[in-house]
Amino acid sequence: MKRHEAREKALQALFQIDVGRIPPDEALHNVTGGGDIDPFLRQLVFGVVEHQEEIDELLRANLEKWTLERVANVDRAILRMATYEMKYADDVPVSVSLDEAVELAKKFGDWKSGSFVNGVLSKVKAALQK
């Protein structure tokens, strides 16, 4: 599975976990149809779940005029996943994480999602580089 596809499936799983309040294993089963789970996909989903408190704290610090709870569900899942990658996935360049997140936002979010996600993650990137 290519990493782009793994990110799409991770987004779908994280959305289910957040909105449907289902366990990560069940969400992964749902998005893979019960098939083999790509290691990168598993890393993204469990990494976000494991570090969600720190991720959310970082996102809250970089949201202007928004609360994390008011952010659209799909955008919130994208922001969490990209922030996880930027902070914890050493094998993924930060610029790749940011670009992939913007593409996912354009595909799965509304017409403003791409620029919103780009703006927030650019601030997260700057905060992480301090």
From Swiss-Prot:
One of its GO terms (cellular component) is cytosol. The keyword Ribonucleoprotein does not apply. CDD domains: Terminator_NusB. Keywords: RNA-binding, Transcription, Transcription antitermination, Transcription regulation. GO terms for biological process: DNA-templated transcription termination; transcription antitermination. GO terms for molecular function: RNA binding. The keyword Cytoplasm does not apply. NCBIfam families: nusB. Belongs to the NusB family. Involved in transcription antitermination. Required for transcription of ribosomal RNA (rRNA) genes. Binds specifically to the boxA antiterminator sequence of the ribosomal RNA (rrn) operons. This is Transcription antitermination protein NusB. It comes from Geobacillus kaustophilus (strain HTA426). The gene is nusB.
